[in-house]
């Protein structure tokens, strides 16, 4: 993260969903777009929260400029995040744990489909 500089440009409180919606501007000249992991750790450190309650929704990089804007959701409780955030966002942010969660859900879905097919016959 030596050539990268992070800056929180906006914070919006969403009391209904018990989260803060944060916009982070990242300047990364002559460097690749920062990873979700690096961004999550930086936001958690800046806001004084646990990394498990920070979820990167999207990172939009402008071509050739070396500037990215990230949309981040910071929850008051990580359990609430697992209920609200879509499965693909959880999988992207949680790494190996997210992949296991995704596989588990896919397996359950396929089992339900099989049961439904058997009932039709």
UniProtKB/Swiss-Prot annotation:
GO MF terms, alphabetically ordered: structural constituent of ribosome
Highest rank taxon of the organism: Archaea
Gene3D superfamilies: 3.30.70.3370
Pfam family, one: Ribosomal_S24e
One of the record's GO cellular component terms: ribosome
Keyword annotations from UniProtKB, A to Z: Ribonucleoprotein, Ribosomal protein
GO biological process: translation
Family: Belongs to the eukaryotic ribosomal protein eS24 family.
Protein name: Small ribosomal subunit protein eS24
Upper classification of the organism: Archaea, Thermoproteota, Thermoprotei, Thermoproteales, Thermoproteaceae
